[in-house]
Amino acid sequence: TAYHILTKLYLTEMKKKNSGTILNVASIAGFMPGPLMATYYATKAYIVRLSESIREELKKEKSKVQISILCPGPVATNFNKVANVKFHLREADSKKVAKYAIKKMEQGKFYIVPGIDVKIARFGVKLLPTSLVSKISYKMQERKIKK
């Protein structure tokens, strides 16, 4: 994918300089199954796993290059307005999410999860069996489709 290729291209140059930071943008969706939106959830999971793998490689190489993953919930964007996308969680302000991401990235945080409701959702996903998370996700997506 283009995401993978661009990350690797920039990473190669950063590693040569032993300096730099990559901020990959995923989603809370990257931590859970997503029936009825499988492709979206899978692409976000890919970004999470790619970033986790690169992070481990950088650690083993003792590189000073940093990588972070932004994993927000719904973010208010013009795309959502035009596409008439509806969410179950409150949409976060895009500028606030961006500022938060930069602040946490500069602090060296790896997983960047803005918003208490999204942090709670991520914690719940860790605790619950995947089969239950999948059923909950299905119901949430099904309700969105019916709106």
Where are the model-predicted features located?
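Catalytic tyrosine of NAD(P)H-dependent dehydrogenase/reductases that use a Tyr as the general acid/base
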Residues: 4, 40
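Active-site helix of classical SDR
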Residues: 7, 43
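A short helix-coil junction within the Rossmann-fold of NAD(P)-dependent oxidoreductases
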Residues: 9-18
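Residue(s) in the substrate-gating loop at a strand-loop-helix junction
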Residues: 27
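Active-site loop immediately N-terminal to the catalytic Tyr-X3-Lys motif
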Residues: 34-38
